[in-house]
């Protein structure tokens, strides 16, 4: 379901400020999925095989993107990216992206890409990825790594559609101890 009054062409993309945090936390970051990615690792000494397989769920999963208020607060620092999408007329925030910078590896880690449920399917996510790429190129970074839980199949498909490619995983990377998949995008 979309909000009929929002004109995507007139939205403002700007750096977040601390006063934006409550509005960002209030966004509906939920998602629905009929699939998850199942990870299998076979460690055979001289060879490690990792298999990623799309698995259909017995019933639709409704879940929430894990948003950490402390992590958002840390994203406000100058060496991180925190950009919000705002309707300039209503002053309503409809989405945001956060990335943390790793200058030693010349990488940005995309941690949050949130578009409010009512405002999806309008290319706002793709526009936020573009903003993230511009930000990363200004810091002369080489790539963006997108961290996605295995249960967020819509985000995985979105990342792939934006040109991100699978580059690894971590069993207990996320705050809720869920498996994180990593997708990279060269700058």
Regions found by a protein language model. Name each.
Residues 16, 113-115, 148:
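Hydrophobic adenine-recognition pocket in adenosine-nucleotide-binding enzymes
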Residues 26-111, 116-117, 130-131, 135, ...:
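Acetyl-CoA-dependent GNAT
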Residues 147-148, 160-181:
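Conserved catalytic-core motifs of GNAT/GCN5-like acyltransferases
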Residues 19-22, 105, 153-154:
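Short alpha-helical
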Residues 115, 121-134, 138, 157-161:
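Conserved acetyl-CoA-binding loop-helix of GNAT-fold acetyltransferases
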Residues 1-10, 25, 32, 177-187:
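Terminal substrate-recognition subdomain of acyl/acetyltransferases
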Residues 136-148:
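Conserved GNAT acetyl-CoA-binding A-motif
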